[in-house]
Amino acid sequence: MSSKVLKIGQITDIHIGEDENLVQGIDVRKNFLTALNSESMKDIDLLVLSGDLANENAEPGAYRYIAEQLKGVKCPVCIIPGNHDSLDVMVKFFDMPVKNGKCYFRYDLEGRSMFFLDSAIGEVSRDQLDWLEEEVPKVDGEVILFMHHPPCFCGHKFMDLHYHLRNMVEVQQVLSKFKNLKHVFCGHYHSEHQMKFSHIHVHAAPP
């Protein structure tokens, strides 16, 4: 396992619209560019876009705009869909691996292994969990997991009640088996949360 410290940038829930019009009064394109070009994104080893790239209806113009901005990013980029995205549309603009109609994959960088899950429909499919159970034990060293929905409640009453991961218990049962999985990074809640279940720390990033 590499001793190099990886610097990973995560951008989530940018909700880009079809055109330059404001989204609910917010200049989301400007916000995206501000995040993309921020000081914290300098010299990163990997950029992760963790879902809800489009605003409401998987607008092609949103993905086209994002893809154009990503051309200037010098590091690798990993993308997973959120509940407002459409994988069928996204793959027309981004290099995203698709298996069984979902976007889930392992990405190795500098001796580190990162796993990415597709929770766009509000749950993690059984085939993804079976794949994790097969692949994670093969890794000698710590692994990192990215997904759109947090795999636990976050203390946000509205989101926890209405928009939580539907098969959360099933997902937790699988993830808890992996002693080399200590950190999960996600989005979806539009606010920052630090939670923990079992031995796993969950980091929900704000937009």
Please identify what each model-predicted range represents.
Residues 10, 49, 79-82, 145, ...:
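Structural beta-sheet core signal
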Residues 1-8, 32-39, 68-77, 100-104, ...:
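Short low-complexity stretches enriched in small and charged residues
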